[in-house]
A protein has these predicted regions:
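Active-site-proximal substrate-binding core of FAD-dependent oxidoreductases
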Residues: 289-326
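A conserved short coil-to-beta-strand element within the FAD-binding core of flavoproteins
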Residues: 11-28
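Single conserved hydrophobic/aromatic residue that forms the stacking wall/gate
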Residues: 1-6, 10, 328-330
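Structured loop/turn residues at beta-strand edges in well-structured enzyme cores
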Residues: 13, 27, 46-47, 252
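C-terminal segments that line or cap access tunnels to active or ligand-binding sites in enzymes
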Residues: 48-55, 60-303
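FAD-binding core/adjacent interface of flavoenzyme oxidoreductases
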Residues: 35-39
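Short polybasic amphipathic segments
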Residues: 30-34
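Core beta-strand elements of the Rossmann-like FAD/NAD(P) dinucleotide-binding domain
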Residues: 40-49
Length: 330
């Protein structure tokens, strides 16, 4: 889409820095410092150029394991990444935020996820027993996440409408597992989640599904393929902050640049959603280009009992909230 709109896309290049000229009455992005194949160069900018900066990055340093290998926890912030870029930008003006409020301790911001693919018909009945829906129906399955409240890892899992992918083989399910406490031993697998292979994470999940213990390892080995991912900074945007630790989308006196994404400050909205990032981009474009168009307001549903009740009924497949049933696993 960008190429068809006469855009030039530069691949295999790192943006190392954006340099600014700061005065009392305006702030101007003057150059972009890039490296390619180890060689540094710069792109000079004028006030008529526009620079949109995604500062920080929740998925930076993410690593992928496999069915038989753990995902490595890599916490080193390197040049050319979103955190290092933001640090260099923030050094130039206080209005550009404080990235170290968010990325200073990956032990506080990490968690792990895994994609599990069931390969036959042996695991799906355990999923159906909990969610009360046929996961092969082509309709909503879990309707959200299922959290195992007594899990040492605080494990959660979900299966969305299947098939998840067009090329997904018939008879297979693709689901998502994640754990918020990656540094403590599991209830069944007696090792931290971050040290576990995909198979071992699947074993822990199967244990919480209620699979008989004498079947767990064999099912995890032969009836599923599980790929773990470690994300050291995935919760960075939830770290405590004040009103200036994130830069405004368009800082005061900014002439030709804006910040985008989860680490740019907007009014009323809450991070963690795709909508948040999209709204920052709309604010940036409309402001810098003087577009006379309103950004969609944040819907004030937080304390609206009508929205809360409507969402509850939807999650219950239209059943009234008075018709409560409980599932007990023994």
């Amino acid at each position: 889409a960008l190429s068809s709109a006469a855009s030039d896309v530069y691949k295999r290049q790192k943006v190392e820095n954006v340099k600014f000229e700061i005065s009392d009455y305006k702030k101007v992005a003057k150059s972009i410092i890039i490296t390619k194949d180890g060689e540094e160069s710069s792109i000079d900018l004028t006030e008529n150029d526009l620079v949109f900066i995604t500062n920080g990055g929740c998925v930076e340093n993410s690593s992928m394991g496999s069915q038989n290998t753990p995902a490595v926890m890599n916490t080193e912030i390197k040049a050319g990444g979103g955190w290092d870029l933001w640090r260099k930008i923030a050094e130039q003006d206080s209005s550009f935020g404080n990235p170290d409020k968010f990325c200073y301790d990956p032990e506080l911001t990490n968690w792990m996820s895994a994609t599990v693919t069931t390969l036959d018909d042996r695991i799906p009945p355990y999923v159906q027993k909990i969610c009360k829906r046929d996961p092969f129906s082509g309709k909503v399955v879990t309707g959200g996440i299922v959290t195992v409240k007594d899990s040492n890892w605080l494990l959660s899992w979900t299966f969305n409408r299947q098939p998840q992918f067009r090329s997904q083989p018939k008879g297979q399910l693709v689901g998502w597992i994640y754990g918020l406490f990656s540094n403590v031993p599991g209830n069944y697998v007696k090792k931290p989640m971050r040290d576990c292979t995909g198979k071992e994470i699947c074993m822990e999940w199967l244990y919480h599904l209620g699979v008989p213990e004498n079947q767990i390892e064999e099912l995890a080995e032969n009836s599923a393929n599980t790929i773990p991912v470690m994300m050291p900074y995935i919760d960075a945007f939830f770290m405590p902050r004040n009103g200036t630790d994130r830069p405004k989308v368009v800082p005061n006196q900014a002439v030709n640049f804006a910040f985008l994404g989860q680490f740019a400050e907007t009014e009323r909205d809450t991070i963690f959603t795709t909508e948040y990032s999209i709204r920052t981009a709309m604010v940036a474009v409309y402001t810098l280009l003087n577009v006379d168009r309103g950004v969609p307001e944040v819907w004030g549903s937080t304390y609206d009992i009508r929205d809360l009740l409507n969402a509850t009924v939807k999650l219950r497949d239209g059943k009234p909230i008075t018709a409560v049933s409980y599932t007990h696993l023994t």
